[in-house]
């Protein structure tokens, strides 16, 4: 069974007034989509873990701990980290932590929660 870590932004800490985000987006919508994605991945035979980052976090030592505590085959970095300008530094930090603590894991990007499994299949 392939082990995958999904890294995303904690929806409870997102500033939904940010004009980069869709106007109707809410934390409930993100949470529902994330749960559905993880359930789909688990049903497809992946062992998935979720790691959420609070907006504005600069200390990613907990992420480093997660990556050293379990050997992951792949790490998915969600579009909420990559695609929102305010999270750009966080994105760089995440990539460097993954590169340092999970050297053998494939780094995977999705464009939407609904294409996460397709994104994983490209690499695993």
Give the residues covered by each predicted segment:
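N-terminal, charge-rich interaction modules
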Residues: 1-20
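Short, well-ordered secondary-structure micro-motifs
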Residues: 16-18, 61, 120
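Short catalytic helix/loop segments, enriched in acidic residues and glycine
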Residues: 22-39
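Ser/Thr/Gly-rich flexible loops in soluble cytosolic domains mediating phosphotransfer, phosphorylation
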Residues: 33, 90-124
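A generic structural motif
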Residues: 42-48
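Short beta->alpha junction loops
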Residues: 49-58, 110-113
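Mid-chain, well-packed structural core segment of small domains
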Residues: 61-97
């Amino acid at each position: 069974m392939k082990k995958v870590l999904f890294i995303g932004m904690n929806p409870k800490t997102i500033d939904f007034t940010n004009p980069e985000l869709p106007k109707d987006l809410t934390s409930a919508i993100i949470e529902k989509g994330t749960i559905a994605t993880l359930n789909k991945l688990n049903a497809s035979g992946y062992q998935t873990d979720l790691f959420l980052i609070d907006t504005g976090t600069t200390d990613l030592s907990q992420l480093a701990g997660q990556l050293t505590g379990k050997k992951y085959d792949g790490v998915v970095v969600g579009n909420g980290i990559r695609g929102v300008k305010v999270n750009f530094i966080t994105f760089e930090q995440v990539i460097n932590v993954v590169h340092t603590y999970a050297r053998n894991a494939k780094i995977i990007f999705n464009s939407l929660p609904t294409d996460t499994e397709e994104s994983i299949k490209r690499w695993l």
